[in-house]
Amino acid sequence: MTTEPGYLSPSVAVATSMPKRGVGAAVLIVPVVSTGEEDRPGAVVASAEPFLRADTVAEIEAGLRALDATGASDQVHRLAVPSLPVGSVLTVGLGKPRREWPADTIRCAAGVAARALNSSEAVITTLAELPGDGICSATVEGLILGSYRFSAFRSDKTAPKDAGLRKITVLCCAKDAKKRALHGAAVATAVATARDLVNTPPSHLFPAEFAKRAKTLSESVGLDVEVIDEKALKKAGYGGVIGVGQGSSRPPRLVRLIHRGSRLAKNPQKAKKVALVGKGITFDTGGISIKPAASMHHMTSDMGGAAAVIATVTLAARLRLPIDVIATVPMAENMPSATAQRPGDVLTQYGGTTVEVLNTDAEGRLILADAIVRACEDKPDYLIETSTLTGAQTVALGTRIPGVMGSDEFRDRVAAISQRVGENGWPMPLPDDLKDDLKSTVADLANVSGQRFAGMLVAGVFLREFVAESVDWAHIDVAGPAYNTGSAWGYTPKGATGVPTRTMFAVLEDIAKNG
């Protein structure tokens, strides 16, 4: 059994014609669309030329008719096609035909197909030849993310018998297909690594171990790493991290990961600097303000923001982004004990702001506040932070749509990019009047309001108090989207999703390109 993080990605190759040999065990994934005939619904192959002969296409479509296939979105069928050298054909429905396809539609279709592969270790696909922007990379991302599995803690008796998807061959004639395919593989591998971290149970991923794994992952791609232990945190005045972590026998950490990408830029002096901050609560009982027992086990995911930040900064180094990226990741375990902070305690955050802790279950904002102040000391141009911040996010937006708060212009930029990459972040306001709800009679701020309304926005207003005025800032609340408690869908498995790794990395790419 292995419990180390770091996803072993399938190999990815690009071909301009159907391989003729050595693919007898492979599955060919072919997209199909509905015919649009209401009285006689059927399915036809969506992308074939120049990879499939007309008689092969006819053979596939005949098999689909025999199965009463309709080409509906996410519908899959397995066919034997003797004229092809592959073991079988797997068709995946895209719904109605389009002139151009949204990348996330193809990403989802690839994920659906990958989840239907069962024991197949090698796939070939014509999905990437469909018209649309970003289709090749989306195809690879969907296949890798859809085939993701986490079995590190299963015994030999219950572990899956197959090795999982190990080889992907993308059929595509575009000149830059290989570059785009490898980019998609790198992004998906980073997301899968974040998933591995989140899926690792808190018995094995506590703050010191989390810091160790972050260090190992980061050093493998050449990042500078600093790990600050509990003694140094206390001495430096990180009151939020220490306060949240003091109830646990497993002390907190703060990790700093630095990608010095400006030296890769054509003009290093003009290269932007981006700070990333992610909440790393390795397990959240709620502390003295304890959570209900029924769903508490899902709080293994309360470090999803930190996992995504670690995955993002390591991906920035791996793909050599020409900007500086500095990640500040606070890590703590929120436990009830004789040493835990109490409702009514006052702590002093890093930087000097005092906070009255009215609810120990609103702990994420306390460790984030410390990290935000430290991150702003680096004088970044932009700050992106993410966390499973509030249950109110799921009330407002559900379990699939992150809430994006922050500086108006940058918030909108982050949300638009999130929607483009398929993580569907939605911009949320931060009304100034909500600050009145955070007034304390004994400290500078209270950590919660006395209202039951606008919980996500109140948390965002709290965090805004710690962001330097000169910094463009966005917070991505992924309380629901970071962890899927329902059934798998598209390229999203049950359990950790890796959201918002793709959003943050796409924002970094956009900043590297456009400033």
Swiss-Prot record:
> Can you say where in the cell this protein is located?
Cytoplasm
Query: Gene3D superfamilies from the entry?
Result: Leucine Aminopeptidase, subunit E, domain 1, Zn peptidases
GO-annotated molecular function = manganese ion binding; metalloaminopeptidase activity; peptidase activity
Q: What is its main location?
A: cytoplasm
Q: Any idea which UniProt keywords this protein has?
A: Aminopeptidase, Cytoplasm, Hydrolase, Manganese, Metal-binding, Protease
Residue sites binding Mn(2+) 2 per the record:
K279, D284, D302, E363
Cofactor needs: Mn(2+)
Q: Which residues form a coiled coil?
A: none
Provide the E.C. number(s) assigned to this enzyme: 3.4.11.1, 3.4.11.10
Amino-acid positions noted as binding Mn(2+) 1 in the UniProt annotation, renumbered to this chain:
D284, D361, E363
Q: Per the annotation, how and in what number is the cofactor bound?
A: Binds 2 manganese ions per subunit.
Q: State one Pfam family annotation.
A: Peptidase_M17
What is an annotated GO biological process for this record, any one?
proteolysis
**CC terms in the record's Gene Ontology section:** cytoplasm; peptidoglycan-based cell wall; plasma membrane
Q: Which CDD domains does the annotation name?
A: Peptidase_M17
Q: Which reaction does it catalyse?
A: Release of an N-terminal amino acid, Xaa-|-Yaa-, in which Xaa is preferably Leu, but may be other amino acids including Pro although not Arg or Lys, and Yaa may be Pro. Amino acid amides and methyl esters are also readily hydrolyzed, but rates on arylamides are exceedingly low; Release of an N-terminal amino acid, preferentially leucine, but not glutamic or aspartic acids
Q: What does this protein do?
A: Presumably involved in the processing and regular turnover of intracellular proteins. Catalyzes the removal of unsubstituted N-terminal amino acids from various peptides.
The family note in this entry says: Belongs to the peptidase M17 family.
Q: What protein is this chain from?
A: Probable cytosol aminopeptidase
The species is Mycobacterium tuberculosis (strain ATCC 25618 / H37Rv)
Gene encoding this chain? pepA
